[in-house]
Amino acid sequence: MATYHNIDRTDQMILALLVKNARMPFLEIARECGVSGAAIHQRVKRLEQAGVITGSRLLVKPQALGLNVCAFVSISLSESTKYPEVIINLKNIPEIVECHFVTGKYAILAKMYCLDNDHLMDVLLNTMQKIPYIQSTDTMISLDQPIERQVWVKDFKRSGDASKKKNSEE
């Protein structure tokens, strides 16, 4: 189970600013948060060490590279215990940018980008469906992506946190 990290209001502000612009200078973040640049540096280091921040990355618009088809592929496995082996093979397909082990009818949900529908069909038929233990695939092509954002960085609590706080105050 993932570790839940308690973060204060300043940490929330830092994260919200960095999610919007990972290149924002620490001094600018410090001005926004009303603390020193050194405090921001220390807090970011602490958030990195705690695993809250796992790095910063440059985002590339797939369409700018001619990758005009975004597809989600639901994958059924003939043997669910072979999931790790299937993932090793899926990692070798550069068109796949994201993969999730999911509940329900399918075992894996993969997100991929292709040049066009012919490219997508080629990857599905000649690469993905030839991987051992992949029983079948079901493909959905994305027509639009009206929402694209990072994780929500606000003052949110787990559902049980409010009751714990209330009980401790009594």
Model-based region annotation:
Residues M1-E170:
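A compositional/biophysical signature of low hydrophobicity enriched in polar/charged and small residues
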